[in-house]
Amino acid sequence: MTMPARGVARLLSGTGLAAALLLPAAVPAQAAPPSRLPAADGKKGQELPGMPSALDPDADAVSCTPASREKAKKQDWSRQRLDLDRLHQYSTGAGVTVALIDTGVVPGAAGLDGRVTAEGTAGDDCVGHGTFLAGLIAGAGDGGPRLTGVAPGAKILALRGTDERGQASAGLVTQALREATEAGADVVAVAAALPRRDTELTRAVADARRAGALVIAAATPDPPRGGTEDIPARTYWPAGEPGVLSVADMLPAGVRPDNAPATSGIDLAAPGAGVVSGGPRGDGHYLGAGASVATAYTAGAAAAVRAVRPDDSADAVARRLTATAYPADIPQLDPYAAVTTVLGDAGAAAGAERAAKPVAVRDTSAADRATERATLFVLLGTGGVLAVLWAAFALPRARARGWRPAAAGGTGSSTGGSVED
């Protein structure tokens, strides 16, 4: 698959941004440090507060994430990379329901009014992370410079997969998955990445898939609050479950962050650093980071696809998302291509294989050496043929002259004989 010219341009333009990017850390909400919005010229841009993925679990009292007083002045790099302005000419995700399992979503938050249904306590989002992700999926972008979500026509079903402080557990995620299945969600986005597999969670994922939902989950946890002595798990759950689309975060340069946990089985990469969205209180903006952000973008893309291809199965949508992604070590999400590309059987098969196994860079060094040897043999063979032809021409003439040198001053060339008097 050849990368489109516009894709090459995006990758090149993003390279200079990575050096200027400061990732927002998931620190206690009351002390969340500001982060910089990457500027188009690669310099440090506007400063916005960071959105934590969880609150400090050791704090004596719960202090919710405060409202941001800052508003983004421009469209961020991630929306430009995903080409949302162009995508929305073909699909807005209308008629599709995305279940978001995270810290909850405030239904009346800026840009989300009329788009959110919250189950149980999920309408109260103290952390703000779930509301932030909902804006990336289906936000209207009210009051911002084209800061819409990937599928602004979709509906959000907010489900709580964490406690009040944003700490996820297998039990809460399992319960939320079952509620999403009962509600008939078309797409399920799971922000949590749990280090251990859970039997009930495995069953809940299988039930959701049998009901026709496309389950999308973060391949790794979001940036931690601080250092840890724990050895990172090689597989996180439910992203590691069969049939779940596992999503990782990438920087503007198209690579994963240096501090990203190592994991296997990643299906897609999507923007996951320096991403702008709103929060549960006020109309200000934050910067978010991590695989959960990339998962939200991918869930929005899945909603956009399901809106225009309602008869496609969840597996077919997953294949389409991977088959139309930008080629890379980890295929990079392209919502516009996923919605508009016409895939044949070969393309679908390629997408299925890519979804099952991450793409590897092919080593061509052996083939290159073989080509060099073949070229050398051809050159040597050609030289031998020319030598034989020269001998067949020159030796009879030299014998006729009695092996004397050719006379000088002729009109012919020195190597081509002479005209005798």
Regions picked out by a protein language model, each given a short descriptive name:
Residues 86-98, 105-116, 123-169, 262-265, ...:
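Subtilisin-like serine protease catalytic core
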Residues 103-107, 142-143, 162-166, 193-197, ...:
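Solvent-exposed loop/turn segments at secondary-structure junctions
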Residues 94-97, 153-155, 183-188, 210-215, ...:
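Loop/turn elements at helix/coil->beta-strand transitions in domains of secreted/extracellular proteins
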Residues 1-33, 378-397:
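Secretory targeting and sorting signals
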Residues 236-307:
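Extracellular S/T/G-rich loop segment that most often corresponds to the catalytic His/Ser-adjacent loop
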Residues 163-237, 293:
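Substrate-binding/access-modulating region of protease and related hydrolase catalytic domains
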Residues 309-421:
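C-terminal subdomain of the subtilisin-like protease fold in secreted/lumenal serine endopeptidases
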Residues 2, 14, 24-95:
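Protease zymogen maturation seam
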